[in-house]
Curated annotation (Swiss-Prot):
This is Putative isocitrate lyase subunit A. It comes from the Bacteria. Its cofactor is Mg(2+). Keywords: Lyase. Its EC number is 4.1.3.1. Residues 334-358 have a biased composition (Low complexity).
Amino acid sequence: MAIAETDTEVHTPFEQDFEKDVAATQRYFDSSRFAGIIRLYTARQVVEQRGTIPVDHIVAREAAGAFYERLRELFAARKSITTFGPYSPGQAVSMKRMGIEAIYLGGWATSAKGSSTEDPGPDLASYPLSQVPDDAAVLVRALLTADRNQHYLRLQMSERQRAATPAYDFRPFIIADAGTGHGGDPHVRNLIRRFVEVGVPGYHIEDQRPGTKKCGHQGGKVLVPSDEQIKRLNAARFQLDIMRVPGIIVARTDAEAANLIDSRADERDQPFLLGATKLDVPSYKSCFLAMVRRFTNWASRSSMVIFSMRLATASTRRPAVGLSAKAFSAWSPTRSTRGGRTASSRSTAFSTRSSRGSWRPGRTTRA
């Protein structure tokens, strides 16, 4: 389903060509391929974004069409494809040779193996927007190369040899991890464009909030409102329509594991939100801020200074008042959950006081 528009007056050949493209795009929207899909934009808006120089993304387009038909066939038969994510192009080729029809390229694989600029770790989507499309490009190139090599070798065979040698399907049936889209609508469109350009036909987009994105096994997931996720999906389909690719979009949710949401603005989310029933109890945020304020003020109350400053103060006061000063180190009370507090990279903070008696040097420790 889509919003249809008609133009009553067309004069110039340029406008006529434009209207023909709009009509063709509307027929494309209304085809059975997109039954049940509601677009929040018009065919005219899509054509306005295409320009006059056609660009054909044949690898992604052909793979998307064939992959979609295969998935619908399996769905009708109540069957599925069991697959996994390869770490290398060689593994992707081996998967195809083993009869695994589809390949899943997860952001977790990109994060886990790292790169020349990124440390390996859990999938927090902290890698650049281009990282997963670049990894996908390597897999697609490997599959296309394997297909060319197979085609050449089979041409050298006799008919009997070809009949005895299995022909593998190296079409890049890939679902790639688009994560949260890496931002707003322009970022989602940019990401989908990159996937299409390297030949990827499928993409999953999840409903976590960028910046707080967590790997599947981690807690603390924060969801965006439903309307924000819909905007992401709509932006992805808009970019695919501009590029004339019937890509496969997987709308993924982390709602099963997440217990936080970014906003309560969308009424569709409100039935699932928790609310306090005792208004005399301070809010969680107020309690948390009070706790932070309590421990933050500790730093000023404890009079933290570096030991050399305390020693200079004690040396100045001693002849002036006729008293000796005692300076001692108290490193442990200043320690946070991540380490001791420091005033610079080479000094440790100290809590100090002066008293009567002889001065003794404190033990210094580098943090």
